[in-house]
Amino acid sequence: MNNEESNAKLRFIISGGGTGGHIFPAISIADALRRRYPECEILFVGAEGRMEMERVPRSGYEIVGLPIKGLDRKHLLSNYKVAIAVIRSMRLANKTIRNFRPDMVIGVGGYASGPTLRRAHSLGIPTLIQEQNSYAGVTNKLLSRGAHKICVAYPEMDKFFSPEKIVFTGNPIRPEIEFGHPSRSESLRFFGFEQSESPVVLVVGGSLGALTINKSIADKLGKWAESGVHLIWQTGKNYIETARKAVENHPGLKCYVNDFITRMDYAYCAADLVVSRAGACSISELCLLGKPTILVPSPNVAEDHQTKNALALSTRAAAVLIPDTEAIELLTDTALSLVRDPAELSSLSEQIRTLAKPQAADRIVDEIARIVEHEKRAN
């Protein structure tokens, strides 16, 4: 059997999701697998009702949804439903793996990766985990015992995983962000701005929005209007109507506001300064592009991992960190002061760029290829 015939038969399952921070890296890995093995088959396994069930098919891949849910830590008595969902998910994961017969299963974190990778382990199918954050999630920590390799984006992850399994690859970046190079004038036009000397601030709260960041901007729109700074504001779907009404009350404000920005390559290119949550994949994009950044970590995430992500940058003078509890008071004034300080913007850009790990998806596929080849030789 020649190499092309062997590659044509390769099948991969990619499992996980829940937020853009899991889904976008998963899709980037899938795209890199297709570039390496054009004839391979890829199946996603996600969680019913979560974002991946829409985003993955839109990217051209099939997906199976498991009825998995997370634990309700506030109402522990209701978790019997979670236990039932886990049992059903294990059965469906077993059926999916047996029918699809993958050569390898890749876990990207999130509820669905648990049943899928556990079943793969029990069937002797090799697995690889991609951990996006500087503080490993519970699911990935549990699954790491059976994984062949664990691809990480931060140093010092041996406090969570076996050192011999760790590969420092960085986080996969969406191809349009990593490889797209739009012009600034084109980017400004997309948001309805004319080419001018006015600085631009991009405010994003992750794929689901961020209430504190939104309120911090909405409550101080008068200052934004007076400053002459142009504002690109992604609110998430839950805040968009409130934000639009607030913007209408400030006719002098130069602001593009939407619930979701379809062209983040344009948004990053146009921005002189970015205000963002501290999700791992957002940080990886900002590092790669060298964007001066204010990070406002979400307090509503497991084990406060966004604060740990943000500290990994702020302690290196690579970003400004504002705690969520202080954002309403400090965020607008800090952003408006910083965006008018070219020396500080330049310093932040230099420092954040040193943390970039380009072509992470291809590095991860390198590890996948080594494991697949090793399994072929062993069998």
Swiss-Prot record:
Cellular component annotations (GO), alphabetically ordered = plasma membrane
InterPro entries assigned to the protein according to its UniProt record, in alphabetical order: GlcNAc_MurG, Glyco_trans_28_C, GlycoTrans_28_N
Highest taxon of source: Bacteria
Q: Name one GO biological process term.
A: regulation of cell shape
Query: Which Pfam families does the entry mention?
Result: Glyco_tran_28_C, Glyco_transf_28
Residues annotated for UDP-N-acetyl-alpha-D-glucosamine binding in this entry: T19, G20, G21, N133, R174, S207, I261, Q306
Listed pathway(s): Cell wall biogenesis; peptidoglycan biosynthesis
Q: What is the protein's membrane topology class?
A: Peripheral membrane protein
The chemistry this enzyme catalyses reads: di-trans,octa-cis-undecaprenyl diphospho-N-acetyl-alpha-D-muramoyl-L-alanyl-D-glutamyl-meso-2,6-diaminopimeloyl-D-alanyl-D-alanine + UDP-N-acetyl-alpha-D-glucosamine = di-trans,octa-cis-undecaprenyl diphospho-[N-acetyl-alpha-D-glucosaminyl-(1->4)]-N-acetyl-alpha-D-muramoyl-L-alanyl-D-glutamyl-meso-2,6-diaminopimeloyl-D-alanyl-D-alanine + UDP + H(+)
Q: Which UniProt keywords apply?
A: Cell cycle, Cell division, Cell inner membrane, Cell membrane, Cell shape, Cell wall biogenesis/degradation, Glycosyltransferase, Membrane, Peptidoglycan synthesis, Transferase
The EC number(s) this enzyme carries:
2.4.1.227
Q: Where in the cell is it found?
A: Cell inner membrane
- What's its job? Cell wall formation. Catalyzes the transfer of a GlcNAc subunit on undecaprenyl-pyrophosphoryl-MurNAc-pentapeptide (lipid intermediate I) to form undecaprenyl-pyrophosphoryl-MurNAc-(pentapeptide)GlcNAc (lipid intermediate II).
The record's family statement is: Belongs to the glycosyltransferase 28 family. MurG subfamily.
Under HAMAP family, the record lists: MurG
What name is this protein filed under?
Answer: UDP-N-acetylglucosamine--N-acetylmuramyl-(pentapeptide) pyrophosphoryl-undecaprenol N-acetylglucosamine transferase
From which source organism is this entry? Porphyromonas gingivalis (strain ATCC BAA-308 / W83)
